Amino acid sequence: MLNISIAIDGPAGAGKSTIAKIIGNKLNIMYINTGSMYRAVTLMALKNNIEPYDIESLKALINSMNISFNGNNIIVNGKDLEEDIRMPIINNNVSKYAAVEEVRELLVSMQQNISKKYNVVMDGRDIGTVVLKDAPYKFFITASAEVRAKRRLKELEEKGINISFQDVLKEIKERDYIDSNRKVNPLKQSKDAILIDTSNFTIEEVVDKICNIIKRD
């Protein structure tokens, strides 16, 4: 399989990361969770008391971050941050940092460089519209806010994080609003992307649907 790139976009909690991860394994191509990159920047910014409006400090921070992936886990400067970036404080702040134009420019450049070297499946908010505009396969994965909140709540409970359904739903809706209304690369479906609503489908059914479309070509 040569020069293949698969773009998977969608709102928070739609299941796109899980779906992209399985597709990467099935097709034996590199999976890049671009959301993890924004989460890692958010984590490092909070640790260093850097506010979203402090552009120069944010740029310096990102340029000091050596980002790589070990399987599905994000590694920054040699440290595995996968568990740290899934904490509620990151969920509540990531959209603010991801909305900063300079942050997006630097991370998009990193993501595009990776796609030039490897066959990739990437998931995020602006993969099909910005990062991999010329990807031959584009999918927009969505589900109702309530379904997404239930999924996210289950994930958090499995990690021992105690939070109410209403709080998770509120967070999902707030992130949807910020992601869809930001000035730079807002969340939207690419015109040539295939829309898949996962509300009434299992992860396995969605993966099979996408893999069948790719293998058909």
Swiss-Prot record:
<dbReference type="GO" id="GO:0036430">
    <property type="term" value="F:CMP kinase activity"/>
</dbReference>
<dbReference type="GO" id="GO:0006220">
    <property type="term" value="P:pyrimidine nucleotide metabolic process"/>
</dbReference>
<keyword id="KW-0067">ATP-binding</keyword>
<keyword id="KW-0808">Transferase</keyword>
<keyword id="KW-0547">Nucleotide-binding</keyword>
<dbReference type="InterPro" id="IPR003136">
    <property type="entry name" value="Cytidylate_kin"/>
</dbReference>
<keyword id="KW-0418">Kinase</keyword>
<dbReference type="GO" id="GO:0005524">
    <property type="term" value="F:ATP binding"/>
</dbReference>
<dbReference type="InterPro" id="IPR011994">
    <property type="entry name" value="Cytidylate_kinase_dom"/>
</dbReference>
<keyword id="KW-0963">Cytoplasm</keyword>
<dbReference type="GO" id="GO:0015949">
    <property type="term" value="P:nucleobase-containing small molecule interconversion"/>
</dbReference>
<comment type="similarity">
    <text>Belongs to the cytidylate kinase family. Type 1 subfamily.</text>
</comment>
<dbReference type="GO" id="GO:0036431">
    <property type="term" value="F:dCMP kinase activity"/>
</dbReference>
<protein>
    <recommendedName>
        <fullName>Cytidylate kinase</fullName>
        <ecNumber>2.7.4.25</ecNumber>
    </recommendedName>
</protein>
<feature type="binding site">
    <location>
        <begin position="10"/>
        <end position="18"/>
    </location>
    <ligand>
        <name>ATP</name>
    </ligand>
</feature>
<dbReference type="Pfam" id="PF02224">
    <property type="entry name" value="Cytidylate_kin"/>
</dbReference>
<dbReference type="GO" id="GO:0005829">
    <property type="term" value="C:cytosol"/>
</dbReference>
<dbReference type="InterPro" id="IPR027417">
    <property type="entry name" value="P-loop_NTPase"/>
</dbReference>
